[in-house]
Amino acid sequence: MNTGLNRRQVLQQSALGFGSLALAGLLSDSARADSTGGTPLAPRAPLFPATAARVLFLFMHGGISHIDSFDPKPQLTAMNGQPLPFAKPKFEFAPTGNLLASPWKFRYYGQSGIEVSDLFPCIGNCVDDIAVIRSMNGSDLVSHGPALLNINTGSGVFARPSLGAWTLYGLGSENQNLPGFISLSPSLYHGGAQNYGASFLPATFQGTRIGDGSTHFRDARLSSLTPGQTPALQRLQLDLLKRRNQRHLAEQGPDSALEARIDSFEMAFRMQAEAPDIMDISRESAAMQKAYGVGAEPTDEFARQCLLARRCLEAGVRFVQVNFSYPRNYWDAHGDLRNNHTSNAARVDQPIAALLQDLKTRGLLAETLVVFATEFGRT
Protein backbone atom coordinates (compact mmCIF):
# COMPACT_ATOMS: atom_id res chain seq x y z
CA MET A 1 0.00 0.00 0.00
CA ASN A 2 1.30 3.44 -0.91
CA THR A 3 1.05 5.63 2.19
CA GLY A 4 2.19 8.78 0.43
CA LEU A 5 4.93 9.36 3.02
CA ASN A 6 8.57 9.54 2.11
CA ARG A 7 11.39 8.50 4.46
CA ARG A 8 11.94 12.01 5.80
CA GLN A 9 8.25 12.48 6.60
CA VAL A 10 8.13 9.17 8.42
CA LEU A 11 11.09 10.22 10.58
CA GLN A 12 9.47 13.56 11.29
CA GLN A 13 6.18 12.00 12.34
CA SER A 14 7.98 9.63 14.71
CA ALA A 15 9.73 12.47 16.56
CA LEU A 16 13.02 12.29 14.66
CA GLY A 17 12.89 8.49 14.70
CA PHE A 18 12.83 8.09 18.47
CA GLY A 19 9.38 6.53 18.28
CA SER A 20 11.03 3.37 16.98
CA LEU A 21 12.80 2.93 20.31
CA ALA A 22 9.43 2.33 21.92
CA LEU A 23 8.16 -0.18 19.37
CA ALA A 24 9.22 -3.18 21.40
CA GLY A 25 7.39 -1.83 24.42
CA LEU A 26 4.30 -1.00 22.39
CA LEU A 27 4.05 -4.57 21.12
CA SER A 28 4.81 -6.36 24.37
CA ASP A 29 2.44 -7.66 26.99
CA SER A 30 4.43 -5.98 29.74
CA ALA A 31 3.98 -2.58 28.10
CA ARG A 32 0.25 -3.13 27.72
CA ALA A 33 0.19 -3.85 31.43
CA ASP A 34 1.89 -0.57 32.32
CA SER A 35 -1.40 1.13 33.08
CA THR A 36 -2.75 -1.77 35.11
CA GLY A 37 -0.20 -2.23 37.84
CA GLY A 38 2.96 -3.55 36.15
CA THR A 39 6.46 -2.16 36.70
CA PRO A 40 6.53 0.57 34.06
CA LEU A 41 10.10 1.75 34.63
CA ALA A 42 11.72 -1.70 34.67
CA PRO A 43 14.51 -1.90 32.05
CA ARG A 44 13.51 -3.59 28.79
CA ALA A 45 15.52 -4.87 25.86
CA PRO A 46 15.12 -2.99 22.56
CA LEU A 47 13.46 -4.61 19.58
CA PHE A 48 16.76 -4.57 17.68
CA PRO A 49 20.35 -4.72 19.00
CA ALA A 50 21.46 -1.17 19.76
CA THR A 51 24.74 0.59 20.43
CA ALA A 52 23.25 3.42 22.49
CA ALA A 53 22.01 2.64 25.99
CA ARG A 54 21.09 6.21 26.92
CA VAL A 55 20.39 9.61 25.35
CA LEU A 56 21.79 13.06 26.08
CA PHE A 57 19.84 15.81 24.32
CA LEU A 58 21.52 19.24 24.30
CA PHE A 59 18.76 21.60 23.23
CA MET A 60 19.53 25.17 22.16
CA HIS A 61 16.35 27.25 22.45
CA GLY A 62 15.72 30.08 20.03
CA GLY A 63 17.31 28.80 16.86
CA ILE A 64 21.08 28.65 16.43
CA SER A 65 21.91 29.82 12.94
CA HIS A 66 23.12 26.73 11.10
CA ILE A 67 24.97 28.80 8.51
CA ASP A 68 26.95 30.53 11.27
CA SER A 69 27.84 27.42 13.25
CA PHE A 70 28.20 24.02 11.55
CA ASP A 71 26.89 24.47 7.99
CA PRO A 72 29.06 26.84 5.92
CA LYS A 73 27.56 28.31 2.75
CA PRO A 74 30.30 29.48 0.34
CA GLN A 75 27.73 30.64 -2.21
CA LEU A 76 26.07 32.83 0.40
CA THR A 77 29.43 34.44 1.10
CA ALA A 78 29.89 35.09 -2.60
CA MET A 79 26.43 36.67 -2.87
CA ASN A 80 26.62 38.69 0.35
CA GLY A 81 24.54 41.87 0.18
CA GLN A 82 22.60 40.87 -2.92
CA PRO A 83 18.79 40.59 -3.04
CA LEU A 84 17.13 37.22 -2.48
CA PRO A 85 17.57 35.42 -5.84
CA PHE A 86 14.26 33.53 -5.61
CA ALA A 87 10.71 34.13 -4.45
CA LYS A 88 10.25 34.40 -0.72
CA PRO A 89 8.43 31.39 0.82
CA LYS A 90 4.71 32.04 1.17
CA PHE A 91 4.60 31.19 4.87
CA GLU A 92 6.91 34.09 5.79
CA PHE A 93 5.51 37.61 5.53
CA ALA A 94 8.04 39.64 7.51
CA PRO A 95 10.20 42.15 5.62
CA THR A 96 13.21 40.53 3.96
CA GLY A 97 16.62 42.18 3.68
CA ASN A 98 19.46 41.31 1.36
CA LEU A 99 21.54 38.17 1.75
CA LEU A 100 23.82 38.15 4.80
CA ALA A 101 26.96 36.05 4.82
CA SER A 102 28.22 34.64 8.07
CA PRO A 103 30.40 37.12 9.97
CA TRP A 104 32.44 34.19 11.33
CA LYS A 105 35.17 32.22 9.63
CA PHE A 106 34.99 28.45 9.30
CA ARG A 107 37.96 26.18 9.96
CA TYR A 108 38.69 22.54 9.26
CA TYR A 109 39.00 20.40 12.39
CA GLY A 110 40.26 16.92 13.14
CA GLN A 111 41.11 14.05 10.83
CA SER A 112 37.60 14.24 9.40
CA GLY A 113 38.18 17.81 8.23
CA ILE A 114 34.67 18.93 9.18
CA GLU A 115 34.23 22.70 9.05
CA VAL A 116 33.13 24.47 12.24
CA SER A 117 32.81 28.21 12.71
CA ASP A 118 34.95 30.25 15.05
CA LEU A 119 31.98 30.39 17.42
CA PHE A 120 32.72 26.85 18.61
CA PRO A 121 36.48 26.19 18.79
CA CYS A 122 36.18 23.77 21.73
CA ILE A 123 33.46 21.70 20.09
CA GLY A 124 35.51 21.85 16.89
CA ASN A 125 38.32 20.03 18.68
CA CYS A 126 35.88 17.17 19.36
CA VAL A 127 34.66 16.98 15.78
CA ASP A 128 36.02 13.48 15.08
CA ASP A 129 33.51 12.18 17.63
CA ILE A 130 30.63 14.12 16.03
CA ALA A 131 28.34 13.42 13.09
CA VAL A 132 27.19 16.74 11.60
CA ILE A 133 23.85 16.37 9.80
CA ARG A 134 23.47 19.18 7.27
CA SER A 135 20.64 17.69 5.22
CA MET A 136 17.88 17.91 7.81
CA ASN A 137 14.85 19.97 6.86
CA GLY A 138 12.48 20.19 9.80
CA SER A 139 9.26 21.80 8.60
CA ASP A 140 7.67 25.10 7.60
CA LEU A 141 6.97 26.00 11.23
CA VAL A 142 8.37 29.50 11.68
CA SER A 143 7.11 30.22 15.22
CA HIS A 144 9.10 29.02 18.20
CA GLY A 145 6.20 27.36 20.04
CA PRO A 146 5.14 24.92 17.30
CA ALA A 147 8.78 24.42 16.26
CA LEU A 148 9.78 23.42 19.81
CA LEU A 149 6.91 20.98 20.05
CA ASN A 150 7.82 19.61 16.64
CA ILE A 151 11.42 18.82 17.51
CA ASN A 152 10.58 17.52 20.99
CA THR A 153 7.46 15.51 20.16
CA GLY A 154 7.31 15.13 16.38
CA SER A 155 4.28 17.38 15.95
CA GLY A 156 3.86 21.12 16.22
CA VAL A 157 0.08 20.83 16.15
CA PHE A 158 -1.12 17.71 17.95
CA ALA A 159 -0.33 16.50 21.47
CA ARG A 160 2.33 13.81 21.28
CA PRO A 161 4.72 12.16 23.77
CA SER A 162 8.16 13.72 24.00
CA LEU A 163 11.38 12.05 22.90
CA GLY A 164 12.34 11.20 26.46
CA ALA A 165 8.91 9.77 27.27
CA TRP A 166 9.02 7.47 24.23
CA THR A 167 12.54 6.35 25.08
CA LEU A 168 11.65 5.62 28.69
CA TYR A 169 8.44 3.86 27.67
CA GLY A 170 10.27 1.61 25.25
CA LEU A 171 13.42 0.85 27.24
CA GLY A 172 12.60 1.50 30.89
CA SER A 173 15.12 2.86 33.38
CA GLU A 174 18.43 1.43 34.54
CA ASN A 175 18.07 2.95 38.02
CA GLN A 176 14.79 2.61 39.90
CA ASN A 177 15.95 5.16 42.49
CA LEU A 178 16.12 8.02 39.99
CA PRO A 179 13.75 9.34 37.33
CA GLY A 180 14.40 7.69 33.98
CA PHE A 181 13.89 10.98 32.12
CA ILE A 182 15.24 14.28 33.46
CA SER A 183 14.98 17.70 31.81
CA LEU A 184 17.38 20.35 33.12
CA SER A 185 16.19 23.98 32.94
CA PRO A 186 13.45 23.55 30.34
CA SER A 187 11.59 26.66 29.27
CA LEU A 188 8.14 27.25 30.71
CA TYR A 189 7.22 28.90 27.40
CA HIS A 190 6.77 27.71 23.80
CA GLY A 191 5.01 24.48 24.70
CA GLY A 192 6.29 24.35 28.27
CA ALA A 193 5.79 20.99 29.95
CA GLN A 194 4.54 19.39 26.73
CA ASN A 195 8.15 19.39 25.53
CA TYR A 196 9.02 16.83 28.21
CA GLY A 197 5.54 15.40 28.74
CA ALA A 198 4.04 11.96 28.15
CA SER A 199 0.80 12.99 26.37
CA PHE A 200 -1.24 9.82 25.75
CA LEU A 201 1.41 7.54 27.28
CA PRO A 202 1.02 6.74 30.99
CA ALA A 203 2.04 9.82 32.95
CA THR A 204 4.78 7.81 34.68
CA PHE A 205 6.93 8.35 31.60
CA GLN A 206 6.91 12.16 31.63
CA GLY A 207 10.14 13.97 32.38
CA THR A 208 11.20 15.23 35.79
CA ARG A 209 12.03 18.92 35.61
CA ILE A 210 15.00 20.33 37.52
CA GLY A 211 15.05 24.11 37.31
CA ASP A 212 13.54 26.14 34.49
CA GLY A 213 14.54 28.70 31.90
CA SER A 214 13.60 31.60 34.17
CA THR A 215 15.93 30.66 37.05
CA HIS A 216 19.72 30.36 37.28
CA PHE A 217 20.57 26.68 37.45
CA ARG A 218 22.66 27.06 40.60
CA ASP A 219 19.35 27.75 42.37
CA ALA A 220 17.58 24.69 40.92
CA ARG A 221 16.41 22.20 43.51
CA LEU A 222 14.51 18.94 43.82
CA SER A 223 12.12 19.57 46.69
CA SER A 224 11.22 17.16 49.49
CA LEU A 225 14.44 15.15 49.31
CA THR A 226 15.26 15.83 52.96
CA PRO A 227 11.94 15.52 54.84
CA GLY A 228 11.61 15.68 58.61
CA GLN A 229 10.14 12.19 59.07
CA THR A 230 12.18 9.06 59.55
CA PRO A 231 12.31 6.57 56.65
CA ALA A 232 10.20 4.11 58.65
CA LEU A 233 7.45 6.67 59.25
CA GLN A 234 7.54 7.76 55.61
CA ARG A 235 7.18 4.14 54.55
CA LEU A 236 4.09 3.72 56.72
CA GLN A 237 2.57 6.92 55.32
CA LEU A 238 3.24 5.89 51.73
CA ASP A 239 1.85 2.40 52.25
CA LEU A 240 -1.35 3.83 53.73
CA LEU A 241 -1.72 6.32 50.88
CA LYS A 242 -1.01 3.62 48.32
CA ARG A 243 -3.67 1.31 49.77
CA ARG A 244 -6.28 4.07 49.68
CA ASN A 245 -5.40 5.02 46.11
CA GLN A 246 -5.46 1.41 44.97
CA ARG A 247 -8.87 0.95 46.58
CA HIS A 248 -10.05 4.00 44.63
CA LEU A 249 -8.65 2.51 41.41
CA ALA A 250 -10.40 -0.79 42.07
CA GLU A 251 -13.71 1.01 42.55
CA GLN A 252 -13.43 3.62 39.79
CA GLY A 253 -11.32 1.83 37.18
CA PRO A 254 -7.90 2.59 35.64
CA ASP A 255 -6.63 6.16 36.02
CA SER A 256 -3.24 6.83 34.45
CA ALA A 257 -2.78 10.14 36.26
CA LEU A 258 -3.48 8.62 39.67
CA GLU A 259 -1.23 5.64 38.97
CA ALA A 260 1.54 8.04 37.97
CA ARG A 261 1.02 9.98 41.20
CA ILE A 262 1.39 6.76 43.20
CA ASP A 263 4.57 5.95 41.29
CA SER A 264 5.89 9.48 41.85
CA PHE A 265 5.46 9.14 45.63
CA GLU A 266 7.39 5.89 45.58
CA MET A 267 10.06 7.42 43.35
CA ALA A 268 10.44 10.42 45.66
CA PHE A 269 10.91 8.07 48.61
CA ARG A 270 13.61 6.08 46.81
CA MET A 271 15.32 9.20 45.48
CA GLN A 272 16.14 10.41 48.99
CA ALA A 273 18.92 7.84 49.21
CA GLU A 274 20.63 8.70 45.93
CA ALA A 275 19.47 11.97 44.36
CA PRO A 276 21.10 14.38 46.86
CA ASP A 277 24.52 12.90 46.10
CA ILE A 278 23.91 13.02 42.34
CA MET A 279 22.76 16.66 42.52
CA ASP A 280 25.83 17.74 44.50
CA ILE A 281 28.39 18.65 41.83
CA SER A 282 30.74 19.92 44.55
CA ARG A 283 31.71 16.25 44.95
CA GLU A 284 33.56 16.59 41.65
CA SER A 285 37.24 17.50 41.80
CA ALA A 286 38.29 21.12 41.40
CA ALA A 287 40.05 20.16 38.16
CA MET A 288 36.89 18.58 36.74
CA GLN A 289 34.76 21.59 37.64
CA LYS A 290 37.32 23.90 36.05
CA ALA A 291 37.38 21.81 32.87
CA TYR A 292 33.62 22.28 32.49
CA GLY A 293 33.79 25.97 33.40
CA VAL A 294 32.03 25.82 36.78
CA GLY A 295 32.73 28.93 38.85
CA ALA A 296 33.85 31.01 35.87
CA GLU A 297 31.91 33.34 33.63
CA PRO A 298 30.30 33.12 31.19
CA THR A 299 30.30 29.31 31.39
CA ASP A 300 29.21 28.67 35.00
CA GLU A 301 25.49 28.07 34.53
CA PHE A 302 25.61 25.76 31.52
CA ALA A 303 28.68 24.03 32.95
CA ARG A 304 26.64 23.10 36.03
CA GLN A 305 23.94 21.63 33.81
CA CYS A 306 26.41 19.62 31.74
CA LEU A 307 28.25 18.29 34.78
CA LEU A 308 25.00 17.23 36.43
CA ALA A 309 23.92 15.62 33.17
CA ARG A 310 27.02 13.44 33.17
CA ARG A 311 26.42 12.46 36.79
CA CYS A 312 22.83 11.50 35.94
CA LEU A 313 23.86 9.44 32.91
CA GLU A 314 26.54 7.72 34.93
CA ALA A 315 23.96 6.87 37.60
CA GLY A 316 21.68 5.15 35.09
CA VAL A 317 19.23 7.84 33.96
CA ARG A 318 18.03 6.77 30.52
CA PHE A 319 17.34 10.19 28.94
CA VAL A 320 18.78 13.54 30.04
CA GLN A 321 17.82 16.76 28.29
CA VAL A 322 20.01 19.82 28.91
CA ASN A 323 18.27 23.03 27.88
CA PHE A 324 19.77 26.42 27.08
CA SER A 325 16.37 28.01 27.28
CA TYR A 326 14.17 31.08 27.22
CA PRO A 327 13.85 33.62 28.73
CA ARG A 328 17.28 33.85 30.38
CA ASN A 329 19.17 32.03 27.63
CA TYR A 330 18.02 32.43 24.06
CA TRP A 331 19.52 32.09 20.59
CA ASP A 332 16.82 34.12 18.83
CA ALA A 333 18.70 36.86 16.95
CA HIS A 334 16.44 38.86 14.68
CA GLY A 335 18.59 41.97 14.48
CA ASP A 336 21.69 41.37 16.58
CA LEU A 337 23.15 38.14 15.27
CA ARG A 338 26.78 38.92 16.02
CA ASN A 339 26.35 39.85 19.69
CA ASN A 340 23.70 37.22 20.39
CA HIS A 341 25.61 34.28 18.98
CA THR A 342 29.01 35.41 20.25
CA SER A 343 27.67 35.70 23.79
CA ASN A 344 25.70 32.45 23.78
CA ALA A 345 28.41 30.37 22.13
CA ALA A 346 30.91 31.51 24.76
CA ARG A 347 28.57 30.15 27.43
CA VAL A 348 28.08 26.66 25.97
CA ASP A 349 31.16 25.83 23.89
CA GLN A 350 33.56 24.85 26.68
CA PRO A 351 30.98 22.97 28.81
CA ILE A 352 29.76 20.87 25.88
CA ALA A 353 33.29 19.99 24.75
CA ALA A 354 34.24 19.07 28.32
CA LEU A 355 31.14 16.90 28.61
CA LEU A 356 31.96 15.02 25.41
CA GLN A 357 35.54 14.45 26.51
CA ASP A 358 34.44 13.41 29.99
CA LEU A 359 31.96 10.87 28.62
CA LYS A 360 34.64 9.52 26.30
CA THR A 361 37.22 9.20 29.07
CA ARG A 362 34.75 7.29 31.24
CA GLY A 363 33.78 4.94 28.42
CA LEU A 364 30.23 6.30 28.29
CA LEU A 365 30.33 8.10 24.95
CA ALA A 366 30.38 4.86 22.96
CA GLU A 367 26.98 3.89 24.34
CA THR A 368 25.41 7.35 24.69
CA LEU A 369 23.55 9.03 21.83
CA VAL A 370 24.42 12.72 22.19
CA VAL A 371 22.14 15.06 20.22
CA PHE A 372 22.85 18.79 19.81
CA ALA A 373 19.86 20.49 18.20
CA THR A 374 17.81 23.65 17.89
CA GLU A 375 14.26 24.26 16.64
CA PHE A 376 15.33 25.97 13.38
CA GLY A 377 18.18 27.93 11.84
CA ARG A 378 18.21 31.27 10.03
CA THR A 379 17.12 31.99 6.49
Regions found by a protein language model. Give the residues of each.
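Ligand-binding pockets and gating/stacking loops
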Residues: M1-T379
